[in-house]
Amino acid sequence: MSKKILKIKDLYKRFGDNEVLRGISLALNEGETKVIIGPSGTGKSTILNCINMLIPPDSGQIWLDGEEITDHVNVKEIRQEIGYVFQDFGLFNHLTALGNVRIGLIRVKKMSKEKANQLAYEELERVGLVDFADSYPAQLSGGQKQRVGIARALAMQPKLILFDEPTSALDPELIGEVLTVMKDLAQEGMTMLVVSHEMGFAKSVSDEIIFMEHGNIVEEGPPQQLFENPQVERTGEFLFKLTELYGEGENS
């Protein structure tokens, strides 16, 4: 039986009069990759922010590896277990690539500088950036910055990594290098929940695709089902429009 790393039950979140999440329930097994798709403003990123305790849900429950974390007092402890790759990279501009990757190891995990350096170099090598360890964010391309962000998340050795539209801030020619790293991670068995409009990645890499609209999950299932035989008409309409707009991406 697969080990359940993430479970969400009846998650609700409102911002003023706008109910962004309307009873979201989903689960993610160890080693699975699920991709959340849907129109802008439908609550996709809010789910990730609730999981990582950046935004408290109004109601509902979240479990990480069997432990309920919804009202967890020690947020820092939870965030050690959950990697987060941001849309806008989220790097510290005054730190080198190496410094950005090791900072959490030293400050949060209280690792020695020597051990943190070793692990940070290993993760930079994993994403193909060991030669840029001493470069600052201003000296890196968008794709390189995002790969540093992925290396930083990996260095914490999390149980789960959340990706919030990791390619949306990139020039088209740089998207492929980030998706290649993510594809490799999926093949290595990393547990990932990804918000993305990259249909090629979703189709070829994800175990399941979750289509959201108006704060609800409209349909969830294997890529083949959603692309070739959607059970809900709206799913087919959205995927047709999205594929027409963006194409099937780098990894189709």
Give residue ranges: language-model regions.
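C-terminal boundary and immediately downstream tail of ABC-type ATPase nucleotide-binding domains
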Residues: 224-252
